[in-house]
């Protein structure tokens, strides 16, 4: 289950009430915290907080975004993830080769961090700074309708496995699969599942 993050909502909102945007973000965080608690009470197994604006506005994210995010996760005992991305692939085609805000999430209360690596060809060395977190590695390029082979997907994951333990890696698509034709999306997901099976066999016993 996903919920919008407090920092991202504060960046999209018009603030006519709070003295500072930081105050606004913290009140959003309190509301998100209640929502997360309700979702777990209703039976959710994982709740993901989407924070794309941390990549878009890293200075403000450092100033008060991480504080707001941690407030949203305060006291939560269920498994939580934070998603940070470059925007939908169908809309934003040019991707930077690295995140402007990512190592900072080592200080986040979440259990998992969801990132994109396929379209951006991310240098996965940055993941070494996130040890202790499970990483959802975006490994499906959603700007290209070509269906990757399982081996292509597996090789993208191997780049992350240079810096992470196998048990800390979760395979996922990059951001924005909803724009793909259903048959293309289905084919890409099947390749991702096949890549996961391939990698499990390859890394069995390496923990």
Predicted regions and their residues:
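Domain-level signal for soluble alpha/beta catalytic cores
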Residues: 1-207
């Amino acid at each position: 289950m996903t919920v919008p993050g407090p920092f991202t909502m504060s960046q999209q909102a018009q603030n006519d009430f709070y003295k500072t945007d930081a105050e606004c973000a913290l009140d959003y965080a309190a509301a998100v915290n209640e929502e997360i608690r309700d979702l777990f009470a209703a039976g959710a197994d994982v709740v993901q907080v989407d924070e794309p604006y941390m990549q878009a506005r890293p200075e403000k994210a450092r100033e008060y975004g991480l504080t707001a995010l941690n407030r949203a996760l305060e006291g939560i005992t269920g498994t939580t993830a934070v998603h940070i991305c470059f925007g939908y692939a169908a809309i934003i085609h040019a991707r930077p080769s690295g995140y402007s805000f990512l190592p900072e999430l080592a200080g986040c209360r979440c259990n998992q961090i969801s990132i994109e690596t396929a379209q951006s060809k991310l240098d996965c060395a940055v993941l070494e700074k996130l040890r202790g977190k499970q990483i959802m590695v975006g490994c499906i390029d959603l700007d290209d309708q070509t269906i990757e082979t399982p081996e292509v997907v597996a090789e993208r994951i191997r780049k992350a496995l240079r810096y992470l333990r196998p048990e800390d890696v979760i395979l996922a698509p990059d951001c924005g699969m909803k724009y793909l034709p259903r048959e293309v999306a289905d084919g890409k997901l099947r390749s991702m599942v096949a890549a996961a099976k391939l990698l499990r066999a390859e890394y069995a016993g390496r923990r």
